[in-house]
């Protein structure tokens, strides 16, 4: 098997997994339309931040409320991208709730 000489690594983060999956599928469709091979999307572990807050402002220490914030993550690799692939990925409009990190090793 040949090792690719060039690849683009894309990491996506979002609080809403539906938005994340939609953005991931848009990126995969764009890359495949231009003829590039795509590895992924690989689901990375979801990080969960939990917060514990007192319900009352003064007394009742035992009465608490818990909140959590889940961050969903995905990883994509685009192998041997063409210039057309890079141009279309730059012009791609993704949802506002998705954080995209692109790495060119």
UniProtKB/Swiss-Prot annotation:
Q: Name one GO molecular function term.
A: structural constituent of ribosome
The role this protein plays is: Involved in the binding of tRNA to the ribosomes.
Q: What is this protein called?
A: Small ribosomal subunit protein uS10
Q: Which GO terms describe its biological process?
A: translation
Q: Which GO terms describe its cellular component?
A: ribonucleoprotein complex; ribosome
Keyword Cell cycle part of the UniProt annotation: no
Ribonucleoprotein listed as a keyword: yes
Q: Name one Pfam family in it.
A: Ribosomal_S10
Q: Which organism is it from?
A: Desulfotalea psychrophila (strain LSv54 / DSM 12343)
Instruction: Spell out the subunit comment.
Output: Part of the 30S ribosomal subunit.
- Lineage from the top down? Bacteria, Pseudomonadati, Thermodesulfobacteriota, Desulfobulbia, Desulfobulbales
